[in-house]
């Protein structure tokens, strides 16, 4: 699994670097500081896991679909509009990853803060979340990335993402962002 992750990350970095000017660490620091998301509290993480029917143990680990104890990851995803910054909760594969998820990162759950709690607005298993530059109802469109030449496309319907056809690899554009990174 580690080799597949390294290979995928290397390919993504190589593709992302094509045709872009190199930046120095000094260039990157102000961007990181300005765009750094607020740290999530332990209570927020627990609330997100409970929103997807998972109960963390004392160390924060959960049981994935393969019955492996794993540590979830939490990533801020900017979607704009009424959603704003959502949270992507990744329940990764463990020792059984290839039999459950193939080369994918695991179970992905996209959550939106609704007051003091969180609600799931999209989920997928074994693929990647692709955030597109296009938007509907003021919120960025998303696609389920993975093998193949076209992928399920989702538009914001005001409360969650609903499937709206497919999108070809070539139509995603260079500005599409893939998660987890």
Residue ranges and their predicted role:
Residues 19-51, 56-60, 65, 131-181:
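Acidic, small-residue rich beta-repeat scaffolds with periodic aromatic anchors
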Residues 64, 117-122:
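A short beta-strand motif characteristic of beta-propeller blades
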Residues 1-8:
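Bacterial N-terminal signal peptides that target proteins for export
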Residues 81-95, 135-145:
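Acidic/hydrophobic-patterned starts of short beta strands in beta-sheet-rich repeat architectures
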Residues 15-17:
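C-terminal motif of bacterial Sec signal peptides marking the signal peptidase cleavage site
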Residues 106-113:
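Beta-propeller blade signature
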Residues 96-103:
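Short consensus segments that form the blades of beta-propeller domains
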Residues 66-76:
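Signature of short aromatic-glycine-proline-rich micro-motifs recurring in repeat-based ectodomains
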């Amino acid at each position: 699994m580690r080799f597949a992750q390294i290979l995928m990350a290397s390919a993504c970095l190589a593709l992302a670097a094509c045709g872009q000017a190199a930046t120095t660490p000094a260039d990157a620091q102000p961007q990181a500081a300005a765009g750094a998301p607020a740290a999530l509290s332990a209570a927020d993480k627990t609330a997100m896991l409970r929103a997807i029917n998972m109960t963390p143990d004392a160390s924060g680990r959960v049981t994935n679909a393969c019955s492996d104890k794993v540590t979830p990851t939490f990533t801020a995803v900017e979607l704009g509009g009424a959603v704003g910054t959502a949270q992507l909760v990744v329940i990764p594969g463990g020792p059984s990853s290839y039999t459950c998820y193939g080369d994918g990162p695991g179970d992905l759950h996209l959550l939106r803060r609704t007051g003091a709690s969180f609600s799931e607005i999209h989920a997928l298993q074994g693929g990647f979340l692709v955030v597109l530059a296009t938007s509907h109802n003021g919120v960025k469109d998303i696609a389920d990335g993975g093998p193949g030449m076209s992928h399920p496309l989702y538009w914001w319907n005001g409360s969650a993402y609903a499937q709206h056809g497919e999108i070809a690899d070539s139509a995603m554009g260079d500005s599409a962002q893939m998660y987890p990174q």
